[in-house]
């Protein structure tokens, strides 16, 4: 397919980094590209974001294109791939939410949550019966410090810990 003179000038100016020409190209093709993305994604805002991202990606490699057909093919392929990646990501996210919801609705979750709360309540009530030093040792141990670290921090013998 032969390019007309306008297309040849457009391609050369884009290739040379002329931002005014990019703006013209953007205004001419943005709605078309968003419409194409919208055939893959339901959210028009997401589609606009995808197209904006592809324009940025194009600008980084603009020197690689010698004709308008190649530029448009790049846009369509990049938009398609970006949309498909978004869909895959959304599917993974949805699967995680579904699995998480199933767990939250399960009896296991209820049992674990109740047990944790009860155990925490019992421990909290029992800690108040410890001496101040014993409380410090316990808190440091719960903070995953070693006996040596606890002894050094509190200035006591390791055997006391």
Where are these regions (language model features)?
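A short pre-motif secondary-structure segment
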Residues: 137-138
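Short, small-hydrophobic-rich alpha-helical interface motif
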Residues: 14, 33, 37, 47-58, ...
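Short amphipathic alpha-helical boundary/capping segments
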Residues: 9-13, 121-130
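N-terminal module of bacterial RNA polymerase sigma factors
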Residues: 1-32, 39
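Internal acidic/polar
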Residues: 4, 85, 93-120
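Sigma70-family region 2
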Residues: 15-16, 42, 53-71, 91
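Arg/Lys-rich amphipathic alpha helix in sigma70-family domain 2
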Residues: 66, 77-97
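Helix-turn-helix DNA-binding module
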Residues: 125-128, 132-133, 143-161
